[in-house]
UniProtKB/Swiss-Prot annotation:
Gene: gmk
Organism, scientific name: Vibrio parahaemolyticus serotype O3:K6 (strain RIMD 2210633)
Keywords: ATP-binding, Cytoplasm, Kinase, Nucleotide-binding, Transferase
Name of the featured protein: Guanylate kinase
Gene3D superfamilies reported in the protein's UniProt record: Guanylate Kinase phosphate binding domain, P-loop containing nucleotide triphosphate hydrolases
Main location: cytoplasm
Length: 207
């Protein structure tokens, strides 16, 4: 059995990254795929579940994990730690399961340095106008917050060229097909196929 592939997925807020990852998992139940769940020291919010949205841990435990080198990357945001578990990702990949890692461009850089075989995907909105419309449609944020998110989006988008693949999420179903095509192509690479079909290949080449 071959190893799984780590997919780094980045996008500005409102580009549809989370929806695409969720749809990929729901519509392709035969694919061995999981989403990486980050560790955090922030308090759990209503509706969140430990181990599903985040692994909620105490600050002391998080700092112990840092000292042990258990994180591929971590950052402190507004006084709370967030980190990606190296151990969980490596164990999952060893089982032949692909892992999606939803992370920003800065975290993506850190991950690529440590796991150069990871594949990276950047998801773009079709226009600034459409991105702003999607953010407004959520109905969650004030005009001030949306303006801030739009500025952050421009900064995030400026790093799209650092990624292996780029998907434009104009039509959701088309973007989802593009997403699946990337996974399919990666699974058909020689290295993956040679591991998957080792017995068959040995038989084909036997004298």
């Amino acid at each position: 059995m071959g190893k799984g592939t780590l997919y780094i997925v980045s996008a500005p807020s409102g580009a549809g990254k989370s929806s695409l990852i969720s749809a990929m998992l729901e519509r392709n139940p035969t694919y061995a795929m999981k989403v990486s769940v980050s560790h955090t020291t922030r308090n759990m919010r209503p509706g969140e579940e430990d181990g599903v949205h985040y692994h909620f841990v105490a600050k002391e435990e998080f700092e112990t994990l840092i000292a042990k080198g258990d994180f591929l990357e971590y950052a402190e945001v507004f006084g709370n730690y967030y980190g990606t578990s190296r151990v969980w990702i490596e164990e999952t990949l060893e089982k032949g399961i692909d892992v999606f890692l939803d992370i920003d461009w800065q975290g993506a850089r850190q991950i690529r340095e440590q796991m150069p075989k990871a594949k990276s995907i950047f998801i773009l909105p079709p226009s600034n106008g459409e991105l702003e419309r999607r953010l407004n449609t959520r109905g969650q944020d004030s005009a001030e917050v949306i303006a801030k998110r739009m500025a952050e989006a421009k900064s995030e988008i400026s790093h799209y060229s650092e990624y292996d693949y780029v998907i434009v999420n104009d039509d959701f179903d088309t973007a989802l097909m593009d997403f699946k095509a990337i996974l399919r192509a990666e699974r058909l690479k020689e290295e993956k196929q040679a591991a998957k079909y080792k017995g068959m290949l040995d038989a084909l080449l036997a004298e």
